[in-house]
Amino acid sequence: MQYKNLGRSGLRVSQLSYGAWVTFGNQLDVKEAKALLQACRDAGVNFFDNAEVYANGRAEEIMGQAMRDLGWRRSDVVVSTKLFWGGQGPNDKGLSRKHIVEGLRGSLKRLDMDYVDVVYCHRPDATTPVEETVRAMNWVIDHGMAFYWGTSEWSAQQITEAWSVANRLDLVGPIVEQPEYNLFSRHKVESEFLPLYSTYGLGLTTWSPLASGVLTGKYAKGNIPADSRFALENYKNLANRSLVDDTLRKVNGLKPIASELGVSLAQLAIAWCASNPNVSSVITGATKENQIVENMKALDVIPLLTPEVVDKIEAVVQSKPKRTESYR
């Protein structure tokens, strides 16, 4: 396992990490979670991602209990959570000072931890002034509830505004963004965010490297495995949007490239994400130990991604974003 600095910070995170979205509390209980988390640690993973909204908070409870039962030292792992959707009350969501402070307290209680290493704004909040959010994030850092803060699914303009406020007030800005990034979703990471990497030292912890499992190659039109994410009732709409003919055609076109390299399609897709130098960590998800073992082998695939192989991939997916023109 390789470890990279999270953006321009001194925090070191494993190049591949594990996230609790969909899995903990939806498909897995504590016993199963313990087995998966230990498989991750055995592979060298030190970064684990969560959110207050995952399984309505149950995902945090399961992760915290599993880590306690496994007897892990808190200082050996990096744990993050995300705040935005906390509950049904008018102040239980968004990025107000009230919800950031109370929401993080709730997350820490569920995790049974004194702090998280990174706390994210799970989405931008158009109803709260950015200055209030920046000040609130600095407050939880100053009070030892978190060490760093970041954003998730924010635009480059929104991140820039947060940094401008932080610099003006001599406060800490967001060191990391968590965007979707895979062979079918590339614009933000490869185009929109380009100025942010050098200007603010922005790090990335990217999610959905397998495009919700589409890039495993296990899905075909009208064929959804019963134990897969798309078989869950809440993900039927996502399945309908994802399993379109053009996407499935491209997936089938990638399979021979993976076969030539002697690797699985999933390993090829994860390695492709991890090979981007601006990506600090690729967040993976799995419901079975063997999936984790196979996913971690993606690290061995990165050296195989020669310019010739990358060109073959590009010829199939045809998803490379055009560089944004600069008029400055």
UniProtKB/Swiss-Prot annotation:
The lineage of its organism: Eukaryota, Viridiplantae, Streptophyta, Embryophyta, Tracheophyta. It comes from Oryza sativa subsp. japonica (Rice). The gene is KOB1. Keywords: Ion channel, Ion transport, NADP, Oxidoreductase, Potassium, Potassium transport, Transport, Voltage-gated channel. Its EC number is 1.1.1.-. InterPro entries: K_chnl_volt-dep_bsu_KCNAB-rel, NADP_OxRdtase_dom, NADP_OxRdtase_dom_sf. In vitro, interacts with the N-terminal part of A.thaliana KAT1, a voltage-gated potassium channel alpha subunit. It is an enzyme of class 1 (oxidoreductase). This is Probable voltage-gated potassium channel subunit beta. NADP(+) binds at residues 21, 27, 49, 152, 178, 207-211, 218, 229, 285, 287, 291, 294-295.
